[in-house]
Amino acid sequence: MAYAQTKTIAVEKIPVIDTAPLRFGTSEAAQAVALKIRQAAEEVGFFYICNHGISEAVIEQAYRAAQGFFSRPKKWKNSVKINSNHHGFLSVGEAKMEQAERVDLKESFVWGLDLPDDHPSVTEKNPFLGRNQWPKEMPELQKGVYPFFEAGLQCGRNMMRAFALGIELPEDSFL
């Protein structure tokens, strides 16, 4: 995949959608949010969300843990170099979008849903699934970032429900 073409849009034209009703509201309130999301996707192609349920404390904890990891020397970070499940550290220049001519100029630490080795999705050799790897000398990385991942996963599930409702499908269609 090559880099996408972009267009300019005034920031004030990007809708900000309050997603709290997806978590706490009535089904009618959730439907109203879903319709706003659909309208934004169709008319603008992008939107911001607020009241998504990821607390500032969880965000700050993840940020501090990531800073602690990325401030370490490359040799140390390579102790958790990316594995066959695509979990772990990638150094500058090691990531490149498919068919792109240039590499990404960033470091990454990739983790995901932590699944045991005997989980059916892992034993079926699904790519990107499996046990995460964390640096043994830095247990605060996992403790700092995994709650952010879990909160983001829940937010994503709420958004998938809204996408389904917005196109008049049962809300669990994409879950």
What are the functions of these language-model segments?
Residues 1-175:
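Peripheral, non-catalytic segments flanking oxidoreductase cores
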